[in-house]
């Protein structure tokens, strides 16, 4: 049994977070386990200053955040494909804002630029300022 004062607690807290992270098969389907894994890894790093697995926990936290960025990007792709540009932009922006170091952030920024260019080219021409008068 692992108690608050157990010598195994450090290892147990790390392994619980890693098990949750490794259990995620597809980042785009369910973010709940990714959010829980991230939280557990952050708690481990915050409370285990002398933890034996700190470096592995940092690496796992980066992996977790990469998967969360991937999730936001893929959800944005879904919305873009079905023509819901507002939803696409929302999820691309979440990837960019929440996970700036992730590789999917670059792709999300590229998609935001593409959608911005597309929306500019789709805007209707402005009406004439003054209508011609009839003779």
Predicted regions and their residues:
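Acidic, polar-rich low-complexity tracts and alpha-helical solenoid repeat scaffolds
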Residues: 1-135
């Amino acid at each position: 049994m692992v108690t608050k004062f157990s010598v195994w607690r450090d290892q147990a807290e790390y392994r619980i977070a890693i098990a949750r992270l490794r259990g995620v098969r597809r980042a785009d389907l369910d973010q709940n386990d990714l959010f829980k894994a991230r939280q557990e890894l952050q708690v481990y790093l915050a409370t285990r200053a002398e933890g034996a697995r700190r470096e592995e926990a940092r690496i796992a936290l980066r992996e977790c955040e990469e998967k969360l960025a991937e999730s936001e990007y893929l959800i944005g792709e879904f919305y873009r494909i079905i023509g819901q540009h507002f939803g696409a932009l929302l999820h691309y922006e979440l990837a960019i804002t929440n996970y700036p170091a992730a590789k999917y952030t670059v792709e999300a920024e590229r998609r935001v630029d593409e959608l911005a260019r597309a929306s500019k080219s789709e805007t209707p021409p402005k009406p004439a300022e003054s209508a011609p008068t009839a003779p």
